[in-house]
Amino acid sequence: MTAPVCVTAPAKINLHLEVLGLRADGFHELAMVMQSIDLQDQLHCENTSDGSISLRCDASELSCGEDNLIVRAARLLRERSGFSELGARMHLKKHIPIGAGLAGGSSDGAAALVALNELWGLSLDASQLERFAAELGSDMPFCVAGGTQLCFGRGERLEPLPPLEAQLGILLVKDPDVSVSTPWAYSECRRQRGSTYLQDEAAFEARREALRAAQWLHPLGGEAPPLRNDLQTVVEPLTPSVRDALQCLASLPNCLQAAMSGSGPSCFALFHNRGEADRAKDQVQTQLDQLGLRSWSCSLIPHGVKLMA
């Protein structure tokens, strides 16, 4: 029987999130730049002899039932493999905050696909795993691949970029008592900004081309595009903790840029390196505590889910 498998499941931030318009299927057409960071969950998997699939987690607030993306990914992969006798006992060590706009759940689901592909000896390649991931969530294909990627469509169409040249540091903050509904954020975006949406595929593609030509690989600053998140314009006015976080981050010395990630409420600031991010965290910790915000200093990483040695 195959030895147990352990993988890391990185969080992501959005360096760019642009809502282009509405698709024929009712979803929003998006243009994003996603980036993996080294705030990571860990998923441990081992075979079961009776074909059962089970999950436990050290975060009591997280459901480990059939609605969990890890369990859903395991069942999908087993179904597609054609081997109904396959089973797994899985344990998630949770470090990415829940409901934070950091794709923690999606990354955990992607981790299950990668880990069980290895555990069960299925030998599926990354593109096959990404296709399965797309059936479960818009962010999940990116979480399989990771690194720095242009993401189009609902987020499932990936165009990899070389790693950012600068070893940027990140200070990430979140109010642990606040979450934002992603469907609400998109519906509110449509209500507020629908009249400005692009109207057809030709217009979508023209905007994609502009993003492909942008200098994403330059150190954040002079030549790099500014951070953009169209959902931030919707969420920030109605979420005091997001306003507080962004004001706090933007005021820090050496902060290059600050923005909200995904549909929030997590916000982040970029620094020239990890050392600057660590020092900024120490400097502002008292203020963050007063605001009720948790914080993490992180680095960019060039990969998604990864097998641990």
UniProtKB/Swiss-Prot annotation:
Catalytic residues in the record: 12, 139
Keywords associated with the record: ATP-binding, Isoprene biosynthesis, Kinase, Nucleotide-binding, Transferase
Keyword Repeat: no
GO molecular function list: 4-(cytidine 5'-diphospho)-2-C-methyl-D-erythritol kinase activity; ATP binding
Coiled-coil regions listed: none
Binding-site residues, ATP: 97-107
Pathway: Isoprenoid biosynthesis; isopentenyl diphosphate biosynthesis via DXP pathway; isopentenyl diphosphate from 1-deoxy-D-xylulose 5-phosphate: step 3/6
Reaction(s) the record says it catalyses: 4-CDP-2-C-methyl-D-erythritol + ATP = 4-CDP-2-C-methyl-D-erythritol 2-phosphate + ADP + H(+)
Name of the top EC class for this enzyme: transferase
InterPro entries linked: GHMP_kinase_C_dom (IPR013750), GHMP_kinase_C_sf (IPR036554), GHMP_kinase_N_dom (IPR006204), IspE (IPR004424), Ribosomal_Su5_D2-typ_SF (IPR020568), Ribsml_uS5_D2-typ_fold_subgr (IPR014721)
GO biological process terms on file: isopentenyl diphosphate biosynthetic process, methylerythritol 4-phosphate pathway; terpenoid biosynthetic process
E.C. designation(s): 2.7.1.148
UniProt keyword annotation of ATP-binding present: yes
Pfam families the UniProt entry points to: GHMP_kinases_C (PF08544), GHMP_kinases_N (PF00288)
Function: Catalyzes the phosphorylation of the position 2 hydroxy group of 4-diphosphocytidyl-2C-methyl-D-erythritol.
Similarity remark: Belongs to the GHMP kinase family. IspE subfamily.
Record-given protein name: 4-diphosphocytidyl-2-C-methyl-D-erythritol kinase
Organism field: Synechococcus sp. (strain WH7803)
